[in-house]
Amino acid sequence: MANVRLENITRRYQNVTAIENISFKIPDGEFWVLVGPSGCGKSTIMRTIVGLETATSGNLYIGDNLVNNIPARQRDVAMVFQNYALYPHMTVGENLAFGLRMRNVDPTKIQERVETVARSLSIDHLLKRKPKQLSGGQQQRVALGRAIAREPKVFLLDEPLSNLDAQLRDDTRAELKQLHQRLGITTVYVTHDQVEAMTLADKIVDLNKGKILQIGEPQSIYAKPANRMVATFLGNPAMNILPAIYTNESFLVGNQHLACPPSIQKKLQPREGQGLELGIRPENIEIFTPQTAEDDDLKTDVWALEKVPLDLEVKVVEPLGRGTLIRASLPLLSAETTVQVQVPASVRLRSGDRLRVQLDFDRLFIFDPSTGEALYP
């Protein structure tokens, strides 16, 4: 096992910069996930680590060794590709043994290692089959097993679950986590799936357009995203972004005013007429219930009495069993935006219904509309 360190890694293809000044260090034994939309550079980073790409500039270390000029076969890393890259003419056992044979390991030890790995992945009954005789999930396990059999210092997995159906993907994701906990091998995992990123990672590296947006533990990034891009990418359903203007101590959203809490005014110090973007997750929007000053809980809560509802029009109702996802429209000055709201399954709504909601301002995010940078909290 080994740590992995990237120092200002840049990769250019003629006039195109795929990744720029990428720097981070993965401690020995940790599971890091590179996440971002297609074309953000995550696969280029992985291919650079494994040695399939050469950095235009910067330094790459595996353990204490600078590996810029070390060929892939000598880096002692193992990669699992999206399409598994199994040899179709070989049996499962031969696929598992391939990397060991290429390193001239003793045949007896190869057989022992293959059997051990196959048992650990519950594929020992498949050793004599060819890849075409396997399901997608079984092929994925064989690809993992081939990497494990080599006992590498670093695992690299490039979207290994993307070809699996939803249920199998969930099951295999849990198995991957258990496998890492058992083996403790430094792992770099590439995905565009934010659920995989949140559930698997010790640390997440958020990327866009070849640059790092944020690095951190999944829950800390979810709770305090550095910018709008990260905020809307992590979370399912995605965070709502509402264009607003600060005026008269309130947020003007379309033609509706939402009173701005004093705590936000004090920290944000907004200017009169300043354009802002309000971010709120669907689970932090509540159906508005009018309250009166006689309510015991509100007698000393002045702010609660000032809460102003937001009126929406229901467009789509998506029952999810344990709850319902509502997609509603919010009229703006020049167009309209879609707002997603999670409501209890007991709430019955239809397309065209009016829906009055209130935002949980304790869970509100505010972004700069020009740069996307987080301004609050």
Where are these regions (language model features)?
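ABC ATPase nucleotide-binding domain
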Residues: 5, 25, 61, 356-358
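Non-catalytic connector elements of ABC transporters
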Residues: 250-377
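Conserved ABC transporter NBD signature motif
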Residues: 58-66
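Helix-to-loop junction immediately C-terminal to a conserved catalytic motif
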Residues: 50
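ABC ATPase nucleotide-binding domains
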Residues: 72-229, 233
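Conserved coupling/switch loops of ABC nucleotide-binding domains, chiefly the family-specific signature
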Residues: 56-59, 109, 209, 364
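The feature captures the beta-strand-to-loop junction immediately N-terminal to the Walker
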Residues: 35-37
